[in-house]
Design a protein with these regions (language model features):
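Short intrinsically disordered, low-complexity coil segments enriched in acidic
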Residues: 1-3, 21-23
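Bacterial N-terminal signal peptides that target proteins for export
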Residues: 2-12
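Bacterial N-terminal signal peptides
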Residues: 11-21
């Protein structure tokens, strides 16, 4: 092995070690509850995005429509919000759901002032994609929930219960919330 190849291998090795060490240093500065909330939120957000972009967007091609009343319709599938909420009902060790300041249903309003404040903070700062915080006997995390497709925005804008009628693709609509009991 010549000197140039050895130098390349050394640089790659250093980059690999540094890239592995940075997350470990960050993890050492983060509480286990914070890490857990972030992992859960990232997973929920990924599943919702995949469901919205692949299942919902492609369903039209086969004569299936996303519908709020999907369970009673012969060619209906659940809406992305219903998908997240349905997954949340299957989980017993923590709460997973959706909240917003202008939800279609009152059950999707924030449960505490801290959740309301966190949502307002996210609305005021578009670069803030995730927040975690302690709130009483719970540790909570919020992941920004956007109108992933124009169909998401259109569905909310056209819904009779919607207090907001001007959503566009990419707008922050609320948040995916995880509530972890600390006691």
């Amino acid at each position: 092995m010549n000197q140039r190849e050895a130098a390349k291998i050394s640089v790659v090795t250093v980059l690999l070690v540094v890239s592995l060490a940075i997350p470990l240093v960050h993890a050492a500065d983060t509480s286990p509850m914070d890490l857990m909330a972030r992992y859960i939120l990232e997973t929920a957000r990924a599943f919702r995005t995949v469901y919205s972009k692949t299942i919902v967007e492609q369903s039209d091609r086969v004569g299936v429509k996303p519908s709020e009343n999907w369970a009673t319709e012969s060619h209906g599938i659940m809406l992305p919000a219903q998908f997240v909420k349905a997954a949340g009902t299957e989980i017993k060790s923590f709460e997973l759901g959706l909240i917003g300041l202008t939800p279609l249903y009152p059950s999707n309003l924030p449960k505490t002032q801290a959740e309301t404040d966190a949502l307002k903070k996210m609305m005021a700062n578009p670069d803030l994609k995730m927040l975690t915080f302690a709130d009483g006997n719970q540790f909570k995390g919020l992941a920004a929930d956007y109108a992933i497709t124009q169909a998401c925005a259109d569905c909310h804008n056209q819904h009779p219960a919607s207090p907001k009628k001007d959503f566009r693709q990419g707008d922050l609509m609320g948040a995916i919330v995880v509530r972890l009991n600390t006691k």
